[in-house]
């Protein structure tokens, strides 16, 4: 990724529902949709921020609010997303654009006791292309669609799902 990513580069999952209603409805009830709003996560995140003030904020949001992580959005001082007027790209947790703007497989460092893991994303939101596992996708007027073979591999989920 050579350009800086802005939080405004990410589309809300609600926009995707216009054409992909079934996928949106499946996502809406998933852990991904609630990755940043689940009370168990929020309690653990707040504990982590207290015990590790220098790494606690970013350590958790890299996977639970990846749009905030890659855009550098400052979540310092945020204890609960409902108490702040945060962009939907953050409150939606792991939404469509996080995965469907991935342009390359994204490995991640495994967590060790003395090192905070850093998720590595190779994404390009805002460019207007959505990637997926369908070869020769239909054209549409909303965004360009492209096939990437990495979407057929579970290893495309490695930025976050890296624990053995």
Protein language model features and the residues they cover:
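Sequence context of c-type cytochrome heme-c attachment sites
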Residues: 1-92, 97-152, 158-162
